[in-house]
């Protein structure tokens, strides 16, 4: 890429991206893999610190990405078409940021060139969650956390 060329995430709309470009937008924060609670009356969404059983604790990536939808029926496959209808992506999510016309933050791997920057910036779930099978799923309200809703710096 020359200095005059814009990176693909600035030059293309989400629906124009190739599959590889689309997938590379995921920074690996894994906040979308946390169990979320929705208030039935207000629609307000709250994140817990309980993660999907398929989340790899070290990499913060899905341990069975190709088969995740079959193994976890609630898992959502994000696409440019359904992104508009998904309102629970965290404020730091690249898909959400770009949809809102914002740029990627400094710690995003496509900007920083370092996958670890997400973790070092404190934007990852790494070291801050329990797996579903380790948590008391009857006490989800006791596991509500606010850190996944931190906006990008």
From Swiss-Prot:
<comment type="similarity">
    <text>Belongs to the UPF0260 family.</text>
</comment>
<dbReference type="InterPro" id="IPR005358">
    <property type="entry name" value="Puta_zinc/iron-chelating_dom"/>
</dbReference>
<dbReference type="InterPro" id="IPR008228">
    <property type="entry name" value="UCP006173"/>
</dbReference>
<dbReference type="Pfam" id="PF03692">
    <property type="entry name" value="CxxCxxCC"/>
</dbReference>
<protein>
    <recommendedName>
        <fullName>UPF0260 protein Plav_0898</fullName>
    </recommendedName>
</protein>
């Amino acid at each position: 890429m020359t200095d005059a060329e814009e990176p693909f995430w600035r030059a293309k709309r989400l629906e124009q991206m190739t599959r590889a470009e689309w997938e590379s937008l995921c920074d690996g924060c894994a906040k979308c893999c946390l169990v979320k609670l929705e208030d039935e009356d207000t629609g307000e969404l709250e994140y817990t610190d309980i993660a999907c059983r398929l989340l790899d604790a070290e990499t913060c990536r899905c341990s069975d990405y190709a088969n995740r939808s079959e193994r976890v029926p609630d898992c959502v496959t994000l696409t440019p078409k359904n992104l508009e209808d998904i309102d629970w992506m965290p404020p730091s999510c690249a898909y959400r940021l770009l949809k809102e016309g914002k740029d990627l933050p400094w710690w995003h791997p496509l900007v920083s060139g370092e996958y670890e920057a997400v973790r070092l910036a404190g934007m990852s779930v790494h070291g801050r969650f329990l797996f579903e099978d380790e948590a008391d799923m009857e006490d989800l309200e006791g596991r509500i956390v606010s850190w996944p809703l931190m906006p990008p710096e």
